[in-house]
Structures are given as structure tokens and as C-alpha cells.
């Protein structure tokens, strides 16, 4: 979700800012690591030191889409040239703001206009008023960037942004900060009536000493402009409409409704008058039976079917009277349209969740190796020719054509300590290391374990199971996590309904049962049920395995299973070699990771989920989780104070120490809301400490982790590129040139890019009682990226932030209502929510016995 520079998303509750916490200044720049020459997809913007005039515009009717508003303003500027606008080229943001280079001759008065736009069928009339608002100083912006002594004036950045986007907003379809245009010369269908559109992202950002234009290629899913009949066939997998001589079944209608609800359609039965409507529902009855009250000329009202009406009024004999109608406009108005007279309107972005297949098609269509993406961005820049844009020229702005050169540093990777007799160490190379010949730092001995196979017996025979367990035991023994003897129980089962009775039987029959290995037949509701029963109901450790990995075992897959199992049972896979850890470890320190995940768009009833995890030892290796539900789309973690308090108590129970420092990595914060969220959450963390002990005031460092940005880094020297995808090396850090003019932020690409172009994570320090130097925090963050237990690779964000994401993701499965849902995003929207807030809160609460384990690994 992208909020504008001016702030919050609509509808989010944010507390007023009583005291504003100032983000810390950059404590100098980092020096550790091997220098590397990079190119960033940032282009220098040169702005004149002038005043820009800011006007407020008000358009009635006021709920028009921005596209219409832009048209209205464009007409107004052309039409009132002689009286008001002269040769000026105003720029407009599509909502309330207009900027000009010289003042309009209206003084401080409000001026009203009437603007007529020729429409299809009839003209549309708009009332527009303009009033002077303020002078925006670009000289101040210059001063802020160069001196670093005054805050960056956001209104100046906003004016620049509007000027830079004005032309593109008229030419293309804007989405957030990106622009898209219909496919030309390529076609990437996604299925289900959706297709890929390519476009570009553009934003202006304050950087060291200058403004920068961030340009990136981007892609998103749009609905294909096509007849609704064809859309329905795609959604329901009907190859040919003539194969559907019968009315839709209930389940077909429900699936179709879910996809088309909320989309705009245009009608084809009125000649040139292609009126557009928004779909609010799909009728249960076919067009031949769906009736509505028709008023006759005599004034009498009769019930008439949609099919009859179209025959009488338009002389149109429906070809598919057995198919339902679309209900459009307002529900209470009963406007019905047969599917066959409707087309899906072009240029509608798909905000609903993509299916797994669509997602993988999308990735295949959009993944570009780093050198290819670099080439594409450069080509995009040339084609955009910003310096020829009349609006940009009007404001005296100049844009450099070449990517910005930056010197980054490749940080040294930490050494990892394993256990066993030989206490081997592993040295990561390009973000990867090997566990062969090494044993877990602390391996668990598994004595009592069970197998539940939910794959059919013909797919997974007993000898296949036997081979799998033999191979798993061999690998686990090598890894120092011996699985002793045969399973105490090994049975086949079917369907989610058999999970709970089976698990209860296991819990009651086998005392000391440590683990249930569950074999799944592909994508199935059984997974959600296994996790609900295991994590929340009975407190039993479960490890799911796909049947394909049982039938065909590979050492890699089995080894990865062991990484997860050992941790779930309380083991430690490896630790950072103690002597190379940062000075912050000299006193007790807790690492917290926090995330908020929202339900997919269009799913208004499901709650948002917040998760906070905390480290429970000094390595840091073991973590404990807390999770809550809250109002949908709420960005602040409302219950943070209680969650942190729980974790501090757990830390004390685990270590017998009170942390003197709290390092908080916060994922998933929209840029426009940083100040409000920091304000609320920093006070919540302090509050948690004071509630435990009146004078307990550990130093807090609050770091926002952002992955959803468009900064990309490329090797300037071809010889430094890594692997097939030609990416920058793992450990590449940048904290100059493209970062904030004076606040404490940096980019760190901590993982090795395998596919596509690596996305460095952006770290923004919003509060720092602990006075970290740039080197200390960058190295600490990089080291934490090596402590993620599920793989022997460095990951793209620090382990605590990653775990918080996993915990929130797991809670989505705990919320699955097994009557309706599969938890896979393909269900009827809005169950698990006929339940009240208390029931939802209870559904995500993890069982006492699971609470202290890393069940989410």
C-alpha cells in the first residue's frame, strides 16, 4: 500500500502526535568491508531555487476518479486560457492540488468555473473552484538537502513529484506510484480473465545533497478487456460456452461472483452509448427467470423477466437465457444485465489475490537478470525523455540521463559454530554454506514419534514410507539429531475431519510423544487443520511433508526437514561464533521482530494479524512468539505493550537476566505513516518495561525494515557480478549518495540473488537510545540475517523480522474455518469472521505447550 508523501492511508486510525520523536541523525558512514562500485536506478534531478505557487482545487461532483478530474482540469486550463491561465502550464495531482511557476491573476480570492466535457450521449457539467493556498519554496528544499540542518520540507518534495508525474498521469494508467499501459507487442495471460501489464515506477526522493528520481520497471495484473461470457468461461474453466447448455451450479455461480463483483462492465446493446456500470452481484436465477418491476406507460407496474424485456425493448433474443444476470449499480435499485451484453472495461487493475499458478506465471513473465533489468531501466529513461517534457521544462527541472554511481561495501560474513564431537565451523561463501560433515550445535534425540499419512495408499505405499523413514533417520543421525527406532504409530488417514480425533488418540496413547510427521497429498485443507490442532488445540509438534518428497527423497529436502524439526523440538542448529559478535552482546540484549499482515484486498471481513517475536538466548538462536488479531487494515500494532511485556517475562524465565537493550526490527510499515507508528509503538515498548518495574528503562533501538521499494543496485564492473542472475554479492551495503540527506538509514543486500534482480532491504533507524555506529548496526543486522534456522543461507531480512512474518502467516491458517475455508486464498470471502472478535482472538492463541517452542519454523 502506498500512501502519498503527505501521510496516512484513508480510514486508518492514528493517534494525534502530542510529542514528536525526532529520528536520529546519521552517526557517520560505515567503513567496514571491501569497497565495490555500483550503479543505482536513481537519476539526479536539478531544481531551480524558485518559489512555486500552490492552489487548492475543488471539483463537484466530488467523488470522481482521478482520471475524470484530470480531464476536467485540462479542459478548464484550455478553456480559460485568456482570462486566467495564459501560457502557464499548471500541474495537477488528480485530487486537490495544482501548482504553477508564476502566480495566477486571482489574488487570494476563490474563483469558480463551470466546465463542460462532451460525453458519450450527453455532456457532463462540473463546478470547479480554485483558491490560492501557499507559496512552496524550492530554495528551502535546496538548503535542507545541502546543509542537513533543517527538516526536508515535504510540501516542496510533493510539488516536485506532481510536476514530474503530470504528463505520465495523462498518458498512462497510474497505479500507486507506477504507470502502466495496455500490452503492445507482448501478451502474458495469467488465466482467470487476468493478464500482465508492464509499466514503470517513478518517485522523487531526497538524497544526500540533491533530489533523485527513482525509476524502475514494474509489472502488475490487470483484468483482460473481453466479453463477460469469455471472462466467465476463463474463471470457471469452461473451454467453450456451448459446452454449458445448463444453468450454472451454485458453486460455479459463487466462484464467478467472487471474481466479477466490484468490476466495471460496459454494455454493448446501445450502439455508441457504451454505458459503464459496477457489478454488485450475480443473480441466482437465469435471465429467462430473473424478474424486475417494470413500469408501463399506463403507470401500472408488472413483473417482467430480463429476457422478455431485452426482446421487447431492444429486439434482442438472448443467446444464453439460461445464464444468470449481472446486478449492477446500487443493490437496492435492481438493475440487471444479461452477461452477453456486457464487456469487462479495459484498464482495471486486479487487487484480488492471485492464485498460486497465477503468481508463478507472473514471476516467470517478470523475472529479469540484473544486467537485463539494468538495460531495461536505461532504455526506459531514454524513451521517457524527461528533459523534453513541457511541464518539466516549465518548472525549470533537469534530469540526468545516467544512473547514479555509488560506492558500496561488501561486509564480511560471520562464521557459524556447529556442535557434535568435531565442533566444526562453517564459513559462508556468497551467502551460502554447507552442513555436510557437521552436526547441530544442540541436536535433540527423538525417541517417540509418529507418522500420519494423508496421501492415498496407492500414491504412497508402505515400502515408500519405510524407505523415507530410513533415509530421514540416516540424514538426521549424520546431523546429530538421532531419530531412534521405528515410529510408535504409522497409519493412513483421509480428510481434515480425521486430524483432531487421530491427534487426540496419539496424545492420550503415547506418553512422551515428541513429533508427528504428517504426509500431505499436495495442496489440501488438511495442512491448516494439522496446524490448528497441533499448535493451538493440543500443543503437539508437527512436521508436514509433501508426498512427492516422500516418494522421491533427496538429501537436500531431508536435510532441510531436519533443520526445521530440530528447532521445533527445542534444539539449536548453529550459533554465531561468539568472539565476532558485536559489542551489544556484552550485556543482556533482546532482539524483537514485528510484523502486521493484512487480509487480501476485497476481503473486508477478515482481521489483520500482528506478530512479535523475541530472542530467548544470547546466541541469539531461540525465539518465542506472540500473536494477536486486530481491526482490518490497521497499521499500528495495537497490543504491542502487552506483547513485548510477555516476551520480556519469557526472556527472564529463559535466561534469568533482564535485557539492558531492546533491538526492535519492524517490518511492514507504509512510508507515509512512519512518524505516527513510531510514536505509538515506541511509547508502547517503554510502557511494557515500566509496567514490569518502575525504574526499568532499557535502551531501545527501533529499526524499520522495508522490502517494498524500488531501489535496485547493479555492479558497475561486469566481473563483480555473481552467478547466473548477475547480481551484487551478498553483504553489499550502501549508506551514501542515494540514502537520506542526514537521517540514519542504509541499504543492505544480505542474500545471494538466485532468480531475477536482488532487492536490497532498506533499514531506517527511527529511534536509537543505544547510540550504534553505522558499522555496528550494519554488521549486527547482517549477522542476524545468518541466524534464520530454516536454511543454510543468509536471508534477505534479519531472522527476528522473518520469524514475525512466519508467525503472522501461520496465524492465518489458525483462523481458517474448516467448514468453508482452505486457507489457500481461493475460498469464499469472509468466513472465519462470522466469528466475533473474542473467537478470532482465541483462534490464534497458541497452546501453552507450544508457546515456548519455535512452532513456526
UniProtKB/Swiss-Prot annotation:
Q: Which Gene3D superfamilies match?
A: 3.40.50.2300, paz domain, Ribonuclease H-like superfamily/Ribonuclease H
Q: Show where the Piwi domain sits.
A: 515-816
Q: Where is this region: Impairs access of bound RNA to the active site?
A: 670-675
Phenotypic consequence of residue 675 to Q: Does not confer enzyme activity by itself. Confers low RNA cleavage activity. Confers modest RNA cleavage activity
| Record-linked InterPro entries | ArgoL1 (IPR014811), ArgoL2 (IPR032472), Argonaute_Mid_dom (IPR032473), Argonaute_N (IPR032474), PAZ_dom (IPR003100), PAZ_dom_sf (IPR036085), Piwi (IPR003165), Piwi_ago-like (IPR045246)
Matches recorded under CDD domains: PAZ_argonaute_like (cd02846), Piwi_ago-like (cd04657)
Q: Tell me what the record says results from residue 253 to H.
A: In NEDLBAS; uncertain significance
Q: Name the consequence of residue 781 to M.
A: In NEDLBAS; uncertain significance
Effect the entry attributes to changing residue 418 to F: In NEDLBAS; uncertain significance
Q: Subunit notes for this chain?
A: Interacts with DDB1, DDX5, DDX6, DHX30, DHX36, DDX47, DICER1, AGO2, ELAVL1, HNRNPF, IGF2BP1, ILF3, IMP8, MATR3, MOV10, PABPC1, PRMT5, RBM4, SART3, TNRC6B, UPF1 and YBX1. Associates with polysomes and messenger ribonucleoproteins (mNRPs). Interacts with LIMD1, WTIP and AJUBA. Interacts with APOBEC3F, APOBEC3G and APOBEC3H.
The protein's role, per its UniProt record: Required for RNA-mediated gene silencing (RNAi). Binds to short RNAs such as microRNAs (miRNAs) or short interfering RNAs (siRNAs), and represses the translation of mRNAs which are complementary to them. Lacks endonuclease activity and does not appear to cleave target mRNAs. Also required for transcriptional gene silencing (TGS) of promoter regions which are complementary to bound short antigene RNAs (agRNAs).
**Involvement in disorder:** Neurodevelopmental disorder with language delay and behavioral abnormalities, with or without seizures: An autosomal dominant neurodevelopmental disorder characterized by global developmental delay with intellectual disability of varying severity, speech and motor delay, and behavioral abnormalities, including autistic features. About half of patients develop seizures.
User: What's the protein called, per UniProt?
Assistant: Protein argonaute-1
This protein's species is Homo sapiens (Human)
